[in-house]
Regions:
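A glycine-rich, often tryptophan-bearing local segment used as a flexible ligand/cofactor-contacting loop or short
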Residues: 106, 115, 124-142
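Portal/gating segments that form or line small-molecule/metal binding sites
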Residues: 37-98
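Short, well-ordered alpha-helix to beta-strand connector turns
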Residues: 57, 80, 113, 154-155, ...
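Catalytic-core regions built around general acid/base machinery
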Residues: 76-79, 100-113
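Short, active-site-adjacent cap segments at secondary-structure transitions
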Residues: 91, 123-126, 192-194
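Catalytic nucleophile loop
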Residues: 84-87, 110-128
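C-terminal and late-domain segments of enzyme folds
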Residues: 1-26, 32-33, 37, 43-44, ...
Length: 212
């Protein structure tokens, strides 16, 4: 059964993760893929997400797909309990995933039930295509990318950071341009889209002062 935890910011909704996983996550092993952030000047969100996983007690194995061999990638994806892909540039990420067939390895693992977690770019790639975020991410950072197909783990199109600074204007533009044409699912940094088999939900981090 397909299990996806698609976020704009994992660290913002980390408290919802264990409930979704349906098991104690302390001691579980996580393949942590920061590749999308390598071409970005701002990268604090990668550290924020890493710290959030560590706080939950997960054991992190960093997997840099742009430098790892296909064999190393396949082994890490197979041996870890969960797979996480960070935010950054969506087009560069997809370029690097396709170079060594990591995209196909991911699809195989996820279709076999491996729990997948994405932040921003790592969630966008679950969509059928990624072209719809070209106003948000620079395509020129992925000059070797020959097509804009995504992993197509879902039939909808994931849009992160909806109306959040500094993406307020660009996310609204994407909604205006694409929502009449495709099944666009915009979420804020405090929300997550979960996929459990055919069941799709949008959840929100509880506000302060509410019980959770």
């Amino acid at each position: 059964m397909k299990r996806l935890f698609l976020t704009s910011s994992f660290s913002s909704v980390a408290k919802l993760f264990e409930d979704f996983a349906g098991e104690p996550v302390k001691g579980k092993k996580l393949a942590f893929i920061p590749t999308a952030s390598l071409v970005e000047k701002v990268r604090f969100y990668v550290d924020d997400d890493r710290k959030a996983f560590e706080k939950l007690g997960l054991i992190i194995e960093e997997l840099e797909v742009s430098t790892a061999t296909t064999e190393e990638i396949a082994q890490a994806l197979e041996q870890n309990d969960y797979i996480f892909i960070s935010g950054g540039n969506t087009f560069y990420l997809m370029q690097e995933l396709k170079k060594k067939g990591t995209d196909k390895l991911l699809i195989e693992q996820i279709n076999n039930g491996k729990l997948y977690i994405g932040t921003s770019a790592g969630s966008i790639i679950a969509s059928p295509t990624i072209e719809f975020v070209s106003d948000m991410d620079e395509t020129k950072k992925a000059l070797e990318l020959t097509d804009y197909s995504g992993l197509h783990l879902v039939d909808f199109y994931f849009l992160p950071h909806y109306l959040n600074f500094p993406f307020k204007e660009v996310t609204q533009k994407i909604v205006n341009d694409y929502s009449p044409k495709i099944d666009l699912r915009p979420i804020s940094n405090n929300q997550v889209i979960t996929v459990l088999g055919n069941e799709i939900k949008t959840l929100e981090k509880p506000k302060r002062g509410t019980k959770k």
